[in-house]
Regions:
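C-terminal motif of bacterial Sec signal peptides marking the signal peptidase cleavage site
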Residues: 16-19
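Carboxylate-rich, divalent-cation-coordinating active-site regions
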Residues: 85-184, 188-190, 208, 221, ...
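Bacterial lipoprotein signal-peptidase II cleavage site
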Residues: 21-28
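Phosphate-group recognition and catalysis centered on beta-loop-alpha active-site segments
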Residues: 326-587
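N-terminal low-complexity, Pro/Thr/Ser-rich intrinsically disordered segments
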Residues: 29-49, 178-188, 329-358
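Short, charged N-terminal beta->alpha structural module
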Residues: 55-80, 197-220
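Acidic/histidine-rich, surface-exposed loop or edge segments in extracytoplasmic proteins
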Residues: 46-62, 188-203, 358-362
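Bacterial N-terminal signal peptides that target proteins for export
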Residues: 1-7
Length: 587
């Protein structure tokens, strides 16, 4: 009797391990029978609570691929109470990581791009597979190989969903599964050949760059690059990917989206990728590509919607309930009312006859973690005229507060790395914001309840209370789109005048001419501001370097004409100021 093997094309199903890929759905099987030789004897991977198989992985493996592998092993342990050993493919006999010849007596599950002959042969057998995976039983081994991390994760999920039986794992000797994401009729193929990307004519560079990069990624995967054009033009086919707030009715129909959030929607011939900011729109584009590559979006013929929920992650933030905050020092020190008066602070910063002002370095670090919401709010309540904060971007384009590129110094990363699907990398750019919410900021070397805050939360604290010293640690932040729209969303535009100067405020005024209150603020401040924030900061640093960050240093600086101090001791400075200064007579 003739046997058949199955060439598997993926259409849509549920992922067994959603924690590995971050998605909740995955492709289902459509099988095409292909006539072949009689099947080989099946492989008994696990039976009677025991297994002789070992998982082999590459010596160097991507964090997320490794996380998927460990989740795969965990699922086997939870079902059968058997923990398969995991070893790397490195051997003393193969120091250069060259191909290890086949040994059928060694029972292995080869996961990823290992140096085993079976893995190499599989990759060579499918040279045209640009995005997808292959799972094959060969030479007593199970080979699970993907073109990228997302595809490998899907392969592990597919194998587990299909092969984890009631009491054993038995794999047919002719087992073969192939998934080609770019096959004819698949979403990537349809997008490449039938869709046009549409961007608003006036969209910032970030949106245009993200759209063009998406088109390039589609070309790399399918060999065909979709067109990218402004919304002032019509597409030939009518099938459009609407990027950002285009003039199309489908974009407007999405409605208002909060600053950090975005929506992905498939409706008829339109695919809408829309965020509440250019950064969020970029995230929507990147997420859409991920959903395509992981097979979550397996058809363009039915309606689909995915929305981010970043604002839900900050629902309990002090920034949304400022009046509930009671600082540690409240029972020891009462701040004079004039020190927290916003108009008084502005005059101190701009008037030659004003008192000495303070720029609090990363917030009230004497009492709270640096760059934390409690630390910033405490500094503001202590009367800080300016608070310096450091900005970085997460993997999913959320502006967060963090000085270092590494998470080692300021968080409990070392205790949580790699656990529960978290990345092992210490670089903040390798973590999504949702993943960062699992970490806690350190104070005096110990973990606190504070999470890494978003710039959105921080901006809410400053509005009408203090000025922002915005120290951006990455180059990819645009003042007149990313920062302006953040300031608009949080009603904090006035708080950026110290850092960006009056010329930027005039530019921002032109971006929203209907904001009369901001127009009046710009007119007023233009009379007083004679130095840019950069020049002011330079003098602040000079004073600290010359005299030190303490009472004697502040006194000497004041006597020499310095008008501001850049301090790590805002609590001490505020007590000094309260004892030695009085309110300024405002003009």
């Amino acid at each position: 009797m003739k046997k058949f093997r199955y060439l598997t094309l993926i259409a849509a199903a549920c992922l067994l391990f959603s924690s590995c890929s971050g998605e909740t759905e995955a492709p289902a099987d459509t099988t095409i029978p292909v006539e072949t030789e009689p099947a080989a004897e099946p492989y008994t991977v696990l039976a009677n609570g025991a297994s002789d198989y070992v998982i082999i992985r590459p010596d160097i493996m991507d964090d997320r691929a490794l996380s998927a592998l460990l989740e795969f092993r965990k699922s086997i342990k939870e079902k059968y109470s058997v923990e398969l050993p995991v070893k790397t493919d490195w051997t003393k006999e193969n120091k250069d990581n060259n191909t290890v010849t086949s040994d059928e007596s060694v029972l292995e599950i080869l996961i990823g791009d290992t140096n085993r002959a079976e893995t190499r042969a599989l990759a060579e057998e499918y040279p045209d597979l640009k995005s997808g995976y292959v799972i094959k039983a060969v030479n007593g081994k199970i080979v699970i190989w993907g073109t990228d991390t997302a595809s490998l994760t899907l392969a592990l999920n597919q194998f587990a969903a299909e092969m984890l039986g009631d009491s054993s794992i038995t794999v047919p000797g002719d087992y073969l599964r192939v998934w080609d994401l770019t096959g004819e009729g698949m979403p990537l193929d349809l997008i490449a050949n039938n869709y046009t990307l549409i961007c608003p004519q006036s969209a910032p560079d970030r949106v245009w760059n993200a759209a063009n990069l998406f088109a390039k990624n589609i070309e790399d995967l399918s060999g065909v690059k979709p067109a990218v054009q402004a919304d002032s033009k019509s597409s030939t086919s009518g099938k459009e990917i609407l990027v950002g707030n285009t003039n199309r009715a489908e974009s407007a129909a999405v409605g208002e989206i909060l600053y950090m959030d975005y929506t992905i929607r498939i409706s008829g011939d339109k695919i809408i990728l829309l965020g509440g900011s250019p950064l969020a729109t970029q995230s929507a584009i990147e997420k859409f590509l991920s959903l395509l590559k992981t097979g979550v979006i397996s058809t363009l013929d039915s309606d689909f919607e995915y929305s981010s929920n970043y604002h839900e992650l900050i629902a309990d933030s002090i920034a949304l309930n400022i009046d509930s905050f009671v600082p540690k020092w409240s029972s020891d020190f009462t701040v004079p009312a004039w020190m927290t008066d916003y108009e008084e602070k502005l005059y101190a910063l701009t008037s030659p006859s004003g008192r000495m002002a303070s720029d609090s370095h990363r917030g009230d670090v004497q009492n709270y973690p640096e760059n934390s919401i409690p630390g910033i709010l405490s500094a503001i309540m202590l009367g800080a005229d300016v608070v310096e904060i450091d900005i970085r971007l997460t993997k999913d384009n959320i502006m967060v507060l963090m000085h270092d590129a590494s998470l080692k110094r300021t968080t409990d990363w070392n205790q949580k790395k790699g656990k529960n699907g978290l990345p092992t990398s210490d670089q903040i750019a390798d973590w999504t914001y949702e993943e960062l919410c699992e970490l806690r900021l350190l104070y005096d070397g110990k973990a606190t309840d504070c999470i890494i805050p978003t710039m959105y939360e921080a901006a809410l604290l400053f509005a009408g209370r203090s000025q922002i010293h915005f120290d951006c640690k990455v180059d990819d932040i645009d003042v007149n789109s990313d920062v302006f729209l953040l300031a608009e969303a949080t009603d904090s535009k006035e708080s950026f005048v110290y850092y960006y100067g009056i010329s930027t405020m005039v530019k921002w005024q032109s971006l929203n001419k209907s904001d009369e209150s901001f127009k009046q603020f710009v007119t007023k401040m233009s009379k007083y501001l004679s130095m840019s924030g950069h020049a002011l900061r330079k003098r602040n640093f000079e004073m600290i370097e010359k005299h030190g960050d303490h009472i004697d240093g502040w006194k000497k600086g004041w006597n020499e004409g310095y008008k501001m101090t850049f301090t790590n001791k805002v609590y001490d400075f505020s007590k000094y100021l309260a004892a030695n200064e009085g309110p300024i007579a405002l003009p």
